[in-house]
Amino acid sequence: VTTILQPRVSLSLASADRDVENTPQRVLLVGQITTAGSVSDGSLTENIASTGDPQDALFGINSQLAAMVREFKKVNPIVRLDAIALDDAAGTAREVTITIVGTATEAGTLTIVAGSEVDHSFDIAVADTDTETAVALAIATAINLDLEAPFTAAAVVGVVTLTAVNLGTVANDLGVEAKGAVAGITGQAVAESVPGATDPTLTDVLDVATLRYQGIVWPWSSNTQTQPVEDYLATRFNADNAITDGVAFTGHVSSHAEALTLLTGLNSHDLVVFSDKQESETNYLGPAQNEASYKKAALFAGIRSLRLTADASISRFLVSSASKDQFGGTALASLPYFNTVLAELPGIAAGRGWTDLEIEQLTDAGAAVMGVNSTGDSGLSGEVVTTYLTDAASNPDVTFTFLNFVDTSSNIREYFFNNYKKRFAQSRLTEGNLSRGRDVANELSIRAFTEQLYQDLSGVDFVLVQSGEDAFNFFKENLDVELDLAVGKVTIEMFVPIVTQLRTIIGTIKIAFSTS
C-alpha cells in the first residue's frame, strides 16, 4: 500500500533535568557473637531484616552483636543495617558476684540489674524466712531465664556469680546492681571478681566492608582498638572520584581522669566516643546510666541515620517543634544533636554521673556525653563532638569538632558531587559560547550551575549553607573556575559558609527602677 506519511515526525523522550539527592543511609555494626550464631567469624551479613528477630539465629540471642541489632531496631527499622560478626578470642570472661547475707524476716522484693536497667532488670520475690541460699538461687534462676541477658548466673550458698556471655574487655563496662531492702537481708554487695580480658584481633576486620557506611558502631574504645576503624574511615574521608566517608561510634566507662587520658591519644573527625562515669558502690558497679556502651552507641547511630533519611518520622527524638524538622532528610544534618531525646535509656540515680564541670572538660577533650533532662524523666544527648581537636600541624582546629559540622560538610559535598556527576556526565568543554541543543559546558555555565547548587543548599529543603544576599555574594566572589581544555579538566575552588548551631546565649540584664 502506498501510504503518504508527510511530514515525518519522530519525538524522543528524555529524562527531566532534576537534582540528584544524597544517597540513602547505611549503617554497619561490628561485634562479638556466640557459638550459637550461624554466621562465621569475620563474615559480613548484609541487609538484616527489620521484622522478626533474625539476629538471634545469626549471631546468638544473648550475644553482644544481637543486642546491638535489637537496640538499633528499637529506634530505626528503616535504614539498611549490615553487621560484621567476630568470634570471641581465647580470652577471659568477666565475672561479677552478688553476695547475699542474712535470712528474710518478712516478705519483700529485691531488684537485680544485670547489664541493662531497661532490658535486664529482675524483681526477685523474697518470702519470709528465705535464706541467703534461697535468695541467691532465685536471682540466678531469674537471670538465666532471660535468654537475651549478657550474663549467665550460678548460685553457690549465698553468692551469685554472673559470667559475661562474650569474652574480653567490652563486658567490663556492663553494670550490675542489687536494689531494694528486705528485712533480715543485711547484705547484697556487688563486686567484680574477674575482669574480662583479651579481645578479638581487629586489624583487618573491616576489609570485607567495601560499601559506604555513613555510620559504624564499634564496641572497643581503647586507643589501639579504635585505630582500625579510624584508619578505615580516614582513607575514605576524601576519596578520589567517590563519596565514601562515614563516622564511627563507640563508648567507654571510666573515671574522669581515665577518660581524659584515653582521649589524649585520639584525634579523628571520623570518631565519636560516648563517655560515661564508672560508679563503684556497695551494691552497684557500672556506668552512671546503666546501659551497655555498645547499645548506647547503636542507639545513637540509629537515631542519626533516621534523622538523615528523607521523610522518616523523627518527632519523638526532637525537642524542637519546627514543623519541617519533624521529618528526616539532609536538612537535619545541621539541626543540633544535643537534646536528642533518648527515651530508650534509663535514668541516672542521684549522686551518680558527671558534674557540669566534668562534662565541659570531657567535651573540650573530644568526648560526647549522654545523660538525662533536668527532671530526670528522659534520656538526652549532650553535645555530640568528634575526637578531632587539631590539624595535621597540631594547630587547634574547630572545623570538624562537632558531629553537626562533619555531617553538614559531608552532605554539602555529596550534593555537589552527585549533581556534577549527573549534569556533566557527557558534556563537551569549551572556552567559547554554548550551542543550543548541544551538551556543552564553559566557565560561565559551570559557574552558574555551581551557584544554583549553592542556592539549593541554602533553601528550606536543605538549610546547610547560609542564605541571603550577603552569603550568596560571598560565595560567588570566592568561587573560582578554571578550565584546561587539553586534558578536559575543570578545577573549582569554593568557600562555603555553613549553617552552625546555637549553643550558647550570654547577655546582661541591667535592673532599672524608673522608666522616666
Report residues per predicted region:
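Disulfide-bonded cysteine-rich modules in secreted/extracellular proteins
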Residues: G91-G102, D199-V205
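Extended, beta-strand-rich, solvent-exposed assembly scaffolds of outer structural proteins
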Residues: A49-F59, T99-G175, D231-N238
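A glycine- and small-residue-enriched flexible loop/hinge signal that marks low-structured segments
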Residues: T141, A209-E431
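Structured, hydrophobic secondary-structure cores that serve as assembly/anchoring elements
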Residues: V1-R80, E344-S516
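Surface-exposed ligand/attachment interfaces on beta-rich extracellular proteins
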Residues: V126-D130, A154-V156, P195-L206, N433-N442
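Extended Gly/Ser/Thr-rich low-complexity repeat segments
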Residues: T169-I185, K295, F300, T508-K510
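A short, well-structured beta->alpha microelement
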Residues: S10, V190-V205, S254-A257
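Bacterial flagellar/type III secretion structural subunits and associated motility module proteins
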Residues: G102, E106-E117, K179-P200
